[in-house]
Regions:
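Ligand-site clamp/hinge motif
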Residues: 196, 228-284, 414-415, 428-430
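Gly/Pro-rich hinge or "lid" segments in bacterial periplasmic/extracellular proteins
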Residues: 176-252, 260, 368-373, 560-566
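Alpha-helical secondary-structure segments
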Residues: 49, 123-130, 161-163, 206-207, ...
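N-terminal lobe/hinge region of extracytoplasmic solute-binding protein
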Residues: 51-101, 132, 203
């Protein structure tokens, strides 16, 4: 029996004693005619108000991109699987799954009774429709890569079979992608999917349904059959110190135009939580009475991408790459640019990941003198206050690409710090500042850059194959650095192959050891997703997340309470 169970039991026993005592002490009533029953008012729903910066133009997962859109969809829609505690993946719309011995074929069985929010049962055909919709030739939305290289087949009403072009071990994680209702969308031509009423009146199979949407945000109501995973964490704080809390029956996602407006709303008591704010505002709000900070480690790495394509010779010598990393004060980046809300990165694998191996990753300390020695080892020589590369007369000046401060203030600030650190060892930097789309399409994809400060989402499984495989190095591929290594290719392929996690952990350690030797990308830091919540909100539990919407992984265990005596 839990502590809360004991509290409830003791309260019930005390109430029973009072009732029995009253029955013994009171004389029999003179009139046995029953008095009219007094109607019991329906209690007001417990409402959790979550503040988010951004706007809402669509809630169709095929096209949702803004932070409010993605957060709402995380509550309205479900995938076959969902995140569990301690890095696990647990069933959601699926009740179970199995894989062939080579990991090429996966069969998922849908949960009997799973239904859309309009009451129609969820079937295997819904899954097949979703996969095919994201693979349509004319689809260019955010889920375009969700089911890439996957063929889906409905075996029967509840069973769906996936065949993978390339077997991978993390397929259950990929199966978290939201499933769409075929009975509402299958007859809509692909070109028209982005213009239906479904965009603003979605029907999902998630734990909350949309009941109202306007310019101020969305109102979501908990489905009556929504239940947390058996593996979900228990709620706190100690119920002896709090009144018995209630489930969150309604979530109001309130949207604000900028960080300042959201921070003001939190200070005014208009929202119960605020996430994704600047480090300064986050630290200010979390210091308010009755507020606390919940930090979710993320899979998004802030790094320096170096152009290692053939014909671009500046960084081909590994001593140069090591010198550039030695020169960067990554601890200062975490302290200053991230406001302490992050961790230094020593490898491309998040420190909170099951795949992280500190011994294999090693650690490159901030050391300007050692950086200069590495440049000398690469054949560079001093020229006044700068450096000259072998075979080149002019001193080295590096281009550093970054997005503008409005688009990504953190990356811009980090780029300024990196430039200052490199200048301190005699390497001046020329900034190229662009919007996000232009930086990617005009610079990173065609390889028209020297170095770039970028955010890389390595994913919950830390599959680094798309990021570094030689097969992805040609222009248009996902290996934007252009780094190619037969040795690393072999290690990456082995690490992503279907195998027990203990085997994969050893293989990932080999990958990290090779990355520490080659340094194809310079890891800087992982920023946390910082979530400021009021102490009346019980339950948000940190775990490694890929997207801020993943913070709702345990939302069905969250509670609202008021301090005892209030």
């Amino acid at each position: 029996m839990t502590r809360r169970d004991r509290t409830v039991a003791l309260a019930a026993m005390a109430l029973l004693v009072v009732i029995v005592g009253a029955m013994v002490a009171l004389p029999p009533p003179a009139d046995t005619t029953a008095a009219p029953a007094t109607p019991v008012p329906t209690p007001a729903p417990r409402i959790f108000r979550d503040g988010v910066v951004g706007s809402i133009s669509t809630l169709d997962p095929l096209f949702a991109r803004t932070r409010p859109e993605l957060d709402i969809d995380a509550l309205v829609f479900s995938g076959l699987t969902r995140l569990g505690p301690d890095g696990t993946v647990v069933p959601d719309l699926a009740s179970s799954w199995s894989a062939s011995s080579d990991g090429r074929t996966w069969t998922f069985r849908l949960r009997p009774g799973a239904a859309w929010q309009d009451g129609i049962p969820v079937t295997a055909q819904d899954v097949v429709f979703t996969v095919q919709a994201t693979q349509a030739a004319d689809y260019r939305g955010p889920l375009a890569g969700a089911w890439q290289g996957v063929t889906a087949q409905a075996v029967d009403r509840l069973d769906v079979r996936f065949t993978l072009a390339t077997p991978v071990a993390d397929f259950p994680l990929a199966a978290r992608s939201p499933i769409l209702p075929a009975h509402l969308l299958a007859d809509v031509p692909g070109a028209n999917l982005g213009g239906t009423s479904f965009e603003l009146a979605p029907v999902g199979a998630g734990p909350y349904r949309l009941v109202r949407l306007d310019a101020t945000g969305a109102v979501l109501e908990r489905m009556s059959d929504a239940a947390p995973s058996p593996a979900a964490p228990s709620v706190g704080p100690d119920p002896l110190l709090w009144q018995l809390p209630d489930d969150i029956q309604q979530i109001d996602v309130r949207v604000y135009p900028d960080d300042a407006a959201l921070a003001a709303a939190f200070q005014a008591g208009q929202v119960d939580a605020a996430g994704g704010l600047s480090p300064d505002l986050t630290n200010q709000l979390s210091a308010l009475p009755g507020a606390r900070l919940v930090r979710y480690p993320r899979t998004v790495l802030t790094a320096v991408m170096l152009n290692l394509r053939f014909g671009h010779n500046v960084f081909q010598n590994v001593h140069v790459r090591r010198a550039l990393l030695l020169a960067i004060d990554r601890n200062a980046i975490v302290r200053q640019q991230m406001g302490g809300l992050g961790v230094r990165a020593d490898t491309l694998v998040p420190p909170s990941s099951w795949a992280f191996n500190a011994q294999a990753a090693g650690s490159v300390a901030y050391d300007r003198a050692a950086a200069a020695k590495e440049l000398v080892a690469a054949g560079w020589r001093r020229s006044g206050s700068g450096w000259v590369r072998p075979g080149v007369k002019a001193p080295v000046t590096l281009e550093l690409l970054t997005v503008d401060a409005t688009t990504n203030p953190l990356d811009y600030a980090v780029a300024v710090q990196v430039a200052a650190d490199w200048k301190a060892i005699g390497i001046p930097v020329r900034f190229t500042v662009l919007g996000a789309d232009q930086a990617v399409n005009d610079k990173l994809v065609p390889g028209n850059y020297d170095a770039a400060v970028v955010d890389l989402n390595v994913g919950l499984d830390a599959d680094l194959y798309p990021l570094l495989a030689s097969a992805q190095a040609p222009v248009g591929g996902s290996n934007l650095s252009g780094f190619q290594s037969v040795t690393l290719d072999r290690l990456l392929e082995a690490a992503r192959a279907y195998a027990p996690q203990s085997t994969r952990a050893r293989r990932m350690a080999a990958v990290e050891a090779d990355l520490a030797k080659e340094l194809p990308i310079l890891p800087l830091a992982y920023a946390d997703y910082a979530y400021v919540v009021r102490n009346t909100v019980q339950g948000p539990t940190p775990r490694l997340i890929s997207d801020p919407g993943d913070r709702y992984w345990d939302v069905l265990t969250w509670r609202l309470a008021t301090a005892a005596g209030q």
